[in-house]
């Protein structure tokens, strides 16, 4: 395959960025999108040019590091992570636009790499269990109803890639935050801190500069792990419950 790439290049958060055009050839349809970018960078290095900076780690759809807007879609045309997107999803001769996540809370570090530490701070504010749970109990000593277990597992699949924020016209992080709240709050171990957890995490999310949620649903559509839109409603219910309890 021969492709034309229009790639966002930006030295740092304070510099102005622009799209740069590159031609790449001999791209196999079996390559992942990141392998295609590797090929581009190899050619740029041979020419003595600066390679394109982009984020990646596991390349197995687990870590959530890869974060590209491809032809206007977070992670590209398929509902998967960028590292699991293959070039067979494109046609020979295509022009492909490659940009970083676009959100005020995700400033550009360089080229296609953005700073997503705002997500880390949301988790640090309450996305954990610190209440003493004692020694490891016998496996069946703390029963968890299957619907609760399924609900928790479904939300624990969130990898924090940020596609929900990139896809949202408001740059909202509600889907991410709701996934992190919901996967702990329904478990017995997470119940003692459920009120403080949701209040603290929502407050931290708001302080990071993410936009407000208007339930457009773009977040759930873009999520490569299928976190459902009703997750947001579940968190809102938790937040209202905790707020009323805090007010007495």
What residue spans do the PLM features occupy?
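Ferredoxin-type iron-sulfur electron-transfer modules in oxidoreductases and energy-metabolism complexes
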Residues: 31-50, 96-248
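Structural beta-strand/beta-sheet cores of well-ordered domains, especially the beta-sheet scaffolds
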Residues: 3, 20, 64, 94-96, ...
């Amino acid at each position: 395959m021969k492709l034309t790439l229009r790639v966002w290049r930006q030295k740092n958060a304070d510099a102005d960025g622009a799209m740069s055009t590159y031609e790449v050839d001999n791209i196999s349809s079996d390559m992942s999108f990141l392998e295609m970018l590797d090929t581009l960078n190899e050619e740029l290095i041979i020419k003595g040019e600066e390679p394109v900076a982009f984020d990646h780690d596991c390349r197995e759809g687990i870590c959530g590091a890869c974060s590209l807007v491809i032809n206007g879609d977070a992670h590209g045309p398929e509902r998967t992570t960028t590292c699991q997107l293959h070039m067979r999803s494109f046609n020979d001769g295509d022009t492909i636009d490659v940009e970083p996540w676009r959100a005020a809370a995700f400033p550009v570090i360089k080229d296609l790499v953005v700073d997503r530490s705002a997500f880390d701070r949301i988790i640090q504010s309450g996305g954990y269990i610190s209440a003493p749970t004692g020694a490891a109990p016998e496996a069946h000593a703390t029963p968890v109803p299957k619907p609760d277990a399924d609900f928790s597992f479904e939300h624990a699949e969130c990898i924090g890639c940020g596609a929900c924020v990139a896809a949202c016209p408001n740059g909202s992080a509600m889907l991410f935050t709701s996934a992190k709240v919901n996967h702990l709050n329904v478990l017995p171990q997470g119940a003692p801190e459920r009120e403080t957890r949701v209040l603290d995490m929502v407050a931290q999310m708001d302080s990071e500069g993410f936009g407000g949620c208007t339930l457009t649903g773009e977040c759930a559509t873009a999520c490569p792990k299928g976190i459902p839109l009703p997750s947001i409603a579940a968190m809102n219910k938790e937040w209202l419950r905790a707020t009323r309890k805090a007010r007495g």
